[in-house]
A protein has these predicted regions:
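PDZ/PDZ-like groove recognition
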Residues: 2-38
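PDZ-domain C-terminal substructure recognizer with occasional recognition of PDZ-binding tails
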Residues: 4, 38, 58-98
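Short, small/polar residue-rich loop motifs at catalytic or cofactor-binding pockets
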Residues: 30, 257-260
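Conserved PDZ fold ligand-binding element
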Residues: 32-54, 265-268, 272-273
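Generic structural signal for buried aliphatic residues
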Residues: 43-44, 57, 69, 90, ...
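Short, Lys/Arg- and Gly-enriched loop/turn segments at beta-strand edges
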Residues: 49-60, 221-223
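Serine endopeptidase catalytic core focused on the charge-relay Asp
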Residues: 87-258, 267-268, 276
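Short beta->alpha transition motifs characteristic of CBS
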Residues: 273-280
Length: 280
């Protein structure tokens, strides 16, 4: 139930947009589109240069100097290749490909559990995805940092609402090892306060009263009352429908809002799941 800040760097440069270029010949061109690249493609090499970040992409385009360069990229989990020829952008005085790329992401999430003996943690309840493309970010490295919740946009019909937070320190309190379908997982050497609790078996979870641990102000988690209305094994990422019945939480946030993902769900003294999505 403790909030944390996330800083994550991707494996390769993710294409998040395109921008046409005025070529020296007077025509408008887009080398990236001409090469068959699409939004959401992850560029991992241009020529002989591995594009681990945005600066490496710029370096690779400069190295090509208008010559055709092989581009290795990943689309839908499959590695592919194409050929791209950068053009000279006189206005920017540099070689360009006509694509916008992103190499990192940052945000706020909620811690689900920490195993104090093994020093591992889980949080967020869903993968970290790029805000423009919706693609899950391929993890190169990542860390979590202390965070404080400073405000909230209330959830309403058709609008999910959102917790707002700020990073309290640049000092990492944990390293992210996995950006998976059910959340982020990693290691930490920092002690977290909390209550030790067994994990329920699937058959022990039942519809009815339950609680969530969440932080909607400051840094301290609180327990709020919810009801588990439906249990399903059909979707491995969404096993329960949970309704907030706690008046204090409804007054402050309107229900589950973005940023509460990862909040642990408790029932009968056991950890039974985590908040993953907001219904709007």
């Amino acid at each position: 139930g403790t909030p944390f800040g996330v800083k994550m760097f991707s494996e390769g440069a993710l294409i998040v947009g395109f921008s046409d270029i005025d070529s020296p010949g007077g025509s408008t061109v887009n080398p990236a589109k001409a090469a068959g690249l699409r939004l959401g493609d992850r560029v991992i090499r241009i020529g002989q240069i591995r594009t681990e970040n945005n600066d490496a992409v710029k370096e690779a385009l400069e190295a090509a100097r208008g010559s055709a360069a092989e581009v290795i990229y990943v689309r839908s989990g499959e590695q592919r290749s194409t050929t791209l020829t950068p053009v000279w952008d006189a206005a920017a005085a540099q070689w360009r490909a006509g694509m916008w790329v992103r190499d990192s992401s940052a945000g706020v999430g909620t811690l689900t559990f920490v195993d104090p003996e093994k020093g591992v943690f889980a949080g967020l309840g869903h993968p970290i995805s790029d805000g423009d493309t919706g693609e899950s970010i391929a993890l190169r490295s990542g860390e979590i940092v202390p965070c404080e919740i400073t405000g909230c946009s209330m959830g309403t019909v058709g609008s999910p609402g959102e917790l707002k937070g700020k990073f309290l320190s640049a000092h990492a309190i944990g390293s992210i090892r996995i950006n998976g379908e059910n959340g982020v997982y990693g290691t930490t050497r920092t002690g977290f306060s909390g209550q030790t609790m067994p994990v329920a078996f699937a058959q022990e979870v039942e519809t009815g009263n339950a609680q969530i641990l969440a932080t909607v102000a400051g840094e301290t988690p609180r327990t709020y009352h919810v009801r588990i209305e439906k249990i399903s094994d059909a979707d491995p990422r969404r096993n329960m429908v949970v309704r907030v019945v706690d008046k204090a939480l409804l007054t402050r946030t309107g229900g589950i809002v973005q940023g509460m993902s990862g909040s642990p769900i408790l029932q009968n003294g056991r950890l039974v799941g985590a908040v993953t999505h907001v219904l709007v």
